[in-house]
Amino acid sequence: MEERYLKMMWELKPLGIIYTCNPSHCFMDLVEELSREIPVAIINNQNEKLNVDAVELDNSKLGRMMAKHLLELGHRKVAYIAPPLTTRQKQRSKRVEGFLKEFAEAGIKDQVIIKAAREELDLDVAHIDSEYKIGYELTRELLEETKDITAIVGLNDMIAFGILDALYEAKIKVPGDISVMGCDNTLFARMHKVELTTIEHFVIFKAVSYTHLR
């Protein structure tokens, strides 16, 4: 589908193209070639292999903000659950790195457990519920491995929903027994049976920033 739309852009020759997601790795050359003829900007995370304009998040800072919030609440032993931390998805790694840096500065980096899904998952076409399943399954594994964590962080809200449901099934109270945090502030973060602590990254401001690109 993505390839079809890119070829359509060649034919339509619009004044500009806004990519609201990261281009698939197999089409990056095509996107870059297209950008030589038509202005292209990505409103997402810049890929170092792709030479086009981008409006992106500082994911390292985002990770630090998440960690700082938990530290201020008194959490010391925490877990961080993420999708595969691959070179193709560097924004994931940067978010985790920022989180770890904040705990390192507090002198307790060794108290953070990082659980990331297998890299093979990134080779398949993602299912709509794949991130939810990552949060759910890795939380179940985590609960078998350790009993003394006080907070679990999901790299994004969908993972956090999986975390919440796994804890609910294990009869662990949130936030009474374990705190849960996500990131993205999706609509469902306010609709879940337990309102999710999350971080807003103001998508509308990204769009405004794009209009200022030259």
What do these predicted regions represent?
Residues 15-17:
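Core AdoMet radical
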Residues 22-25, 34:
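Beta-alpha junction/loop-to-helix N-cap segments that form part of ligand/metal-binding clefts
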Residues 20-23, 83-84:
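Structural motif
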Residues 3-13, 28, 35-42, 46-214:
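Bacterial carbohydrate/catabolite-sensing allosteric modules
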